[in-house]
A protein has these predicted regions:
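SAM-dependent Rossmann-like transferase core, predominantly class I methyltransferases
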Residues: 3-42, 48-60, 205, 219-221
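Conserved Class I SAM-dependent methyltransferase catalytic core
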Residues: 20, 143-203
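Mobile active-site "lid"/loop adjacent to the S-adenosyl-L-methionine
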Residues: 120-147
Length: 227
């Protein structure tokens, strides 16, 4: 293992990464900015990796919203260990951690969250990467989009929100699967690499038990994709 400490770019906060494991991309930061915080939110981060989505979300909102708390769910123990180190490094006491398969989330988490964040594997099946630990972060080898939707519905309170992103060409599938588990899409935002380019990502906010009505936000240009 080769651990490095990187800047989050907010208030001097830092995150612990491992160069031998999957490292976060700009997509995670986009999702943390897309998701909306409310006072008292109890937040779950599914497929958390080293925790960048939840940590960045907390950094953005900790001074604006009160009593935020988090549980990070991650299958790979080495990545979960990194997130624990990051929480300790930054003095974050609002974070708990849960290992194991997302499909086997403990009963104690049933309807206990007001917000679920999820940056999931984008690609369907097929193991092509020499490093299995990195491959399962990119491909649906250990969890599928439908399993994520089902688990999010299980974990969310009525009226709770799911903020999730995926490849733009999976929009129809995402809407269908979310609705199947009583998660109504309320906000939609495409992400493109440059102005006028075809979107490559889609970010959705869905509400458990919400009424049908969606707000389509302006396409977001990801400056990182232009560098």
């Amino acid at each position: 293992m080769s651990e490095v400490i990187e800047e989050m770019g907010i208030d001097g906060l830092q995150i612990v990464q491992d160069t031998d494991l999957y490292r976060f991309t700009s997509d995670s930061v986009l999702l943390s900015r897309f998701a909306r915080a409310k006072n008292g939110d109890r937040v779950a981060d599914f497929c958390a990796g080293s925790g960048i989505v939840a940590f960045h979300f907390h950094a953005l909102n900790r001074q604006k919203k009160k009593n935020l708390s988090y549980v990070l769910f991650e299958l790979q123990e080495p990545l979960l260990a990194l997130s624990k180190k990051t929480a300790k490094l930054n003095g974050f006491e609002q974070f708990d951690f849960c290992g194991g398969r997302l499909q086997e989330i403990p009963q104690r988490y049933r309807e206990s969250f007001s917000l679920v964040l999820c940056n999931p594997p984008y690609e369907r099946g097929g193991f092509e990467n020499d490093c299995y630990e990195k491959a399962i972060c990119r491909k649906e080898l250990t969890v599928t989009l439908e399993e994520i939707a089902k688990t999010a519905s299980f974990a969310l309170k009525f009226g709770g929100r799911l903020a999730i992103l995926n490849r733009a060409d999976r929009l129809a599938e995402m809407c269908y699967v979310l609705k199947k588990y009583n998660l109504e899409v309320k906000r939609v935002q495409f992400v493109a690499g440059k102005t006028g380019a075809k979107p490559y990502l889609i970010m959705l906010e869905a509400v458990k038990g919400g009424k049908p009505a969606s707000e389509i936000l302006p396409t977001l240009i990801n400056q990182k994709e232009q560098e």
